[in-house]
Amino acid sequence: MVRENTEIKLFAGTGNPKLCHDIAGWLGLPLGDVRIDRFSDGETYVQYKESVRGADAFIIQPTCPPVDTNLVELLILIDAMRRASADRITAVLPYFGYARQEKKDRPREAITAKLIADVLTASGADRVITMDLHADAIQGFFNIPLDHLTARGMFADYFQQKALENVVIVSPDEGRVKQARKLVRQLNAPLAVGYKHHEMHGHTEITDLAGDVKGKTPIILEDMITTGGSIIECVRTLVEHGCKPEIHICATHGVLTMDAVDRLNDHPAIAEVIITDSIPLAPEKRRPKITQLSVAAMFGEAIHRVNQDMSVSSLFD
């Protein structure tokens, strides 16, 4: 999969070891040898155990929970790589933490997503590959190239194989309408859009629903599920508007904090929750209604194309 005479090296952080190995396996490449330790006070130590001089290096590390630990580890991995004279350093973040803090909703707040973009660049990253950012505008926070992948096509393929009848695609809020419309075209289904009102620290109320869902089978498209509160609220609204109580949910990033997995699995109107392995799903979070799809091939192909100086966006056009 890699062109001759170009030294590409893959390295994995500790945030999602299985996905890293699956990506390396798809590319037919070994993961590079790197030592990652924690000192007794919690500080992170990194040492590359092989030469990376002149390499086209890719560091795979999602900034999923524990977010700060994984983020700092990634920054140190990038810094050590830069100091070891790699030719190009690409940070591969299957999940981009802090993406929900992309604007100021209240006075005296930070725009943390912009800060993270700045520190990734300052640490030495030349390029970033990520997937389904919470807000497309985050791409503009970077002064280096960013390849923005999406799992929408995977979800479309999944539901085409299921051959559900009388489907309606649901965007829980205005922010996902663009991707939802693309899924509408792929599945030849109508669209419904919810309108959210956000309260402090995650409480969400859907105040209106545009589109006809009565008697239809909804497919909700989201970028992430954290506590599950927004999804449960969306499900409640759909049921109130007369949909079939067989609701399918697809979300790229299964953060799934607190009791989210039980809230989703135990809800009688939810038929299935489809997530990807951008974030590892711990054994204790596995439930019958939760299905996990792999993004290893997608990231492997993106890495291959970056290395070959080929178009990445054409994967999704």
Task: Label every PLM stretch briefly.
Residues M1-D317:
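PRPP-associated nucleotide enzymes
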